From Swiss-Prot:
Family: Belongs to the KdpA family.
Name of the protein in question: Potassium-transporting ATPase potassium-binding subunit
Organism, as annotated: Citrobacter koseri (strain ATCC BAA-895 / CDC 4225-83 / SGSC4696)
Gene giving rise to this polypeptide: kdpA
GO CC terms: plasma membrane
Membrane topology designation: Multi-pass membrane protein
Principal location class: membrane
Key words of the record: Cell inner membrane, Cell membrane, Ion transport, Membrane, Potassium, Potassium transport, Transmembrane, Transmembrane helix, Transport
Length: 559
């Protein structure tokens, strides 16, 4: 079993890096404001036709454009969900959503979280899924990538105050990166058996004589960008464990690769754009080491199974509860780590049914900010925040002014870095405390004791870090939970983007200093270790008390 797990993880990473390297080259061209081959004339027509100014923006203008797009998208999607019953492509005549569920869902998809307090096939029309959620899957992914483009330019440019043009970046990312890749993946899903139609739900009688209603819909087109954009919200309530979304072992592997493809490619692009490929490779090494260790822990926990079941002489020691039998324990464990290391949240197994330690690892990966590959754009700018913190700590130890890629890191950058890193832990801990202190919060818990606390902690961690997965034993479709999680999602997304853009605005005007004998190398094994240690230190200091009350206490109670 250990050999199978090793081969599965190694083959996954090998294929990922082979696919991500060429994509990183294309992304680096866009970061450096170089049109992709054959696109320059099309872009000129687009800029004229859409009235887009090609003038570059400073960080405040860039941020304002990003916020404007997202707030407009939030308003449109909220109204669309409220009035769903008045819109076309609703063959099941589904009613509009309640105000709190519509608000939660709109914020969820605009922030790239895709938390779902509903079942897609019983709640949303085809129009809401296509024109509402799928559109936001593209725009939220493009937003994250645009922000990391601006931050990378801040490191590579000098003595100017502009970071590019947000509207041009958003159009290029959507047209030349997201749409072509999503189309290819969607066609593969359709060929493998995923649904793509606008038919009414189909009634049929099973071989047992039971009448059932099969949901239909444009699944493959949404599924592709759901994974590629690290969105994660399923067309169906069962998410990627549903055979209409994920019909085969091939599509399952493609889904996992799609989740990590752009985050890994952005690391390569960062190295190319900065002029030192070793910088991108350093980030990939740090991310990969944490990822592999987490996969090993989850696989080990799930293979050992539940001690309570083993006492009754179960046929297998594997923890198959909540697992899709088509994929098994090892693949389910790998998928769980992939989807929570990134800000995706799609699932092929119920994380609530994992062992205590097996479920703690996905929770912890979210809590450290999803910087292990992470979401499209957000994962890399989150990890770069930890890079700045690691450089600062190293500077304190050796008595030098910290610098990274030749840019001196001053008080302003460190204040913004600390603010961005502390936003999500504050939301998680205060949100969990609020839920546990109030009767309305506790009433949503369907399990007592440490596991019930873990469900609450997981939900708030997922929302604040824009993941969207859940321990399912929580009744979240209530005004309290919808509003609390909506607030966490909104602040967790834009409360980090704003200081990241402020850091970019501060760094871009600085001159790049040549390396000196006293400069800390940020591309070697020593710095990889320092970076991993910084991530672990922040995660440990912040969340160990909360984890001790939940999954750790539950694990100890099993023996």
């Amino acid at each position: 079993m250990a050999a199978q797990g090793f081969l599965l993880t190694a083959s996954f990473l090998l294929i990922l890096f082979v696919l991500a390297r060429p994509l990183g080259v294309g992304l680096a061209r866009l970061i450096n404001d170089i049109p992709l081959p054959g696109t320059a004339s099309v872009e000129r027509l687009l800029w004229r036709g859409l009235g887009i100014s090609t003038q570059e923006m400073d960080w405040k203008q860039y941020l304002l454009a990003i916020l404007t797009l997202n707030l407009l998208g939030l308003t449109v999607l909220f109204l669309m969900l409220l009035g769903q019953n008045l819109l076309p492509l609703n063959p099941q005549q589904l009613p509009g959503l309640s105000w709190h569920l519509a608000l939660n869902t709109a914020i969820s998809f605009v922030t790239n979280t895709n938390w779902q307090s509903y079942g897609g096939e019983t709640t949303l029309s085809y129009f809401s899924q296509m024109a509402g959620l799928t559109v936001q899957n593209f725009l939220s992914a493009a937003t994250g990538i645009a922000v990391i483009f601006a931050l990378i330019r801040a490191f590579t440019r000098q003595n100017i105050d502009t970071l590019g043009n947000a509207w041009m970046d958003l159009v290029r990312i959507t047209l030349w990166i997201l749409l072509p890749l999503a189309l290819l993946i969607a066609l593969l899903f359709i060929q493998q058996g995923a649904l793509q139609n606008l038919l009414p739900y189909q009634s049929f009688t099973s071989v047992e004589g039971v009448k059932q209603l099969l949901p239909m819909g444009p699944v493959a087109s949404q599924e592709a960008i759901k994974m590629l954009g690290t969105n994660g919200g399923g067309f169906f309530n069962a998410n990627s464990s549903h055979p209409f979304e994920n019909p085969s072992a091939l599509t399952n592997m493609v889904q996992m690769l799609a989740i990590f493809l752009i985050p890994a490619a952005l690391c390569f692009a960062f190295g190319d754009a900065s002029g030192d490929r070793r910088q991108g490779q350093m980030l990939l090494w740090a991310m990969s080491i944490i990822f592999v260790v987490c996969v090993a822990v989850v696989m080990s926990a799930e293979v050992q199974g539940n001690p309570h079941l083993l006492k009754f002489g179960t046929d297998s020691s594997l923890n198959m509860e909540g697992k899709e039998s088509r994929f098994g324990v090892l693949v389910s464990s790998l998928f769980a780590v992939v989807t929570t290391a990134a800000s995706c949240g799609a699932v092929i197994a119920m994380h609530d049914s994992f062992t205590a330690l097996g479920g703690m690892v996905p929770m912890w990966l979210m809590q450290i900010g999803e910087v292990v590959f992470g979401g499209v754009g957000s994962g890399l700018y989150g990890m770069l925040l930890f890079v700045l913190l690691a450089v600062f700590i190293a500077g304190l130890m050796i008595g030098r002014t910290p610098e990274y890629l030749g840019k001196k890191i001053d008080v302003r950058e460190m204040k913004m870095t600390a603010l961005a890193i502390l936003i999500t832990p504050t939301l998680v801990l205060l949100g969990t405390a609020l839920a546990m202190m109030t009767e309305t919060g506790r009433s949503g818990m369907l399990n007592p004791g440490p596991h019930g606390f873990s469900e609450v902690l997981y939900a708030v961690s997922s929302a604040a870090n824009n993941n969207g997965s859940a321990f399912a034993g929580l009744n979240a479709n209530t005004p309290f939970w919808n509003c609390l999680l909506a607030f966490c999602m909104f602040v967790g997304r834009f409360g980090v983007i704003i200081p990241v853009m402020a850091i970019a605005g501060s760094l871009v005007g600085k001159k790049r200093q040549p390396a000196s004998p006293g400069t800390l190398p940020t591309h070697g094994a020593l710095f990889v270790g320092l970076l991993i240690g910084t991530v672990l230190l922040v995660g440990a200091l912040t969340f160990i008390p909360a984890l001790a009350l939940g999954p750790v206490a539950e694990h100890l109670s099993l023996y």
